[in-house]
Amino acid sequence: MPANTRHRRETKWFPSVWRLCLLAGLCLPLTGCIEDQMTLNLVGYNHTDRSIHRYGVNEYGGGHLQAHRGGGGFTCCISIPRAYKPGMTVTVWGSDWDGKNAIKRVVEVPRYGPDEGGRFAVHFLRGGEVKVFVTMMGLGHPDYPLKGEDAEL
């Protein structure tokens, strides 16, 4: 076998190794994004007179909410930044069975701390307003962020 052919065969793998290293190097910064996220259970509360067939936050679906009910079930999971970012918003969506009363709201997420994660609560309030909270507590707890008439189901 000529020496030139042998050398080519031994170095054939070399470009593949470089491609693999380049791919790994490009993916490395993405691991920082993943580490900066916290995963929360999604929970919904419907304070309105109409059932909500489906609801969700951004691309995460939450299921069905009967009128004047909620908090009884959790959907896994929603990811948000571990560190609060001022002005952070989410898109909350929902619809009834026939889709005629679909809603879509861009809602600002109130300030939260990294130790407050546990639930991402969505409240569909009377009058079409939507509020969200990152909290460890359930509706009815004295320290729950939603107070007064708004907190009534």
Label the model's feature ranges.
Residues 42-51:
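Structural motif
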Residues 28-32:
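C-terminal motif of bacterial Sec signal peptides marking the signal peptidase cleavage site
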Residues 3-22:
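Bacterial N-terminal signal peptides that target proteins for export
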Residues 55-100:
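Tryptophan-paired
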